[in-house]
């Protein structure tokens, strides 16, 4: 399993747009085989900081998601509106209350 955590902050005037862009790519992700991945986005309170946690069964599904046009568009627009650079962390999966993949 591949687990990646990405934390970043956007400019305050971009928070609403960022949420809209997230919902757009999540809509497309929901059309894919959800048994192969879990993609979760969190916002730190009412702040401008977002955390994306992605869990992929394998490299193939990760590559597929990273090529979804709406996700690429989200990344492009987000990068133009960053308040802080994204921090990317590769995590080790220990366990969950729900069976994954």
Model-identified regions with their sequence ranges:
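Residue-level signal for secondary-structure boundary sites
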Residues: 14-16, 60-62, 96
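Short hydrophobic/aromatic beta-strand micro-patches
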Residues: 7-9, 53-55
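Glycine-rich beta-strand-turn "strand-cap" elements at beta-sheet edges
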Residues: 2, 8, 36-48, 76-101
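Short, surface-exposed ligand-recognition loops at beta-strand->loop->(often short) alpha-helix junctions
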Residues: 9-20
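An amphipathic, aromatic/His-enriched active-site/gating alpha helix that lines ligand/cofactor pockets
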Residues: 24, 28-37, 55-89
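Short coil/turn motifs at secondary-structure junctions
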Residues: 11-13, 43-45, 57-59
């Amino acid at each position: 399993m591949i687990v990646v955590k990405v934390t970043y902050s956007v400019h305050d005037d971009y928070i609403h747009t960022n949420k809209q862009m997230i919902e757009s790519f999540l809509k497309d992700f929901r059309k894919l085989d959800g048994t192969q991945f879990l993609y979760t986005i969190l916002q730190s309170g009412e702040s401008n900081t977002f955390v994306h946690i992605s869990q992929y069964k394998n490299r193939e599904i990760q590559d597929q998601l990273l090529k979804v046009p709406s996700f690429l568009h989200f990344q492009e627009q987000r990068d133009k509106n960053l308040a802080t650079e994204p921090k990317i962390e590769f995590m080790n999966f220990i366990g969950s209350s729900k069976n994954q993949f």
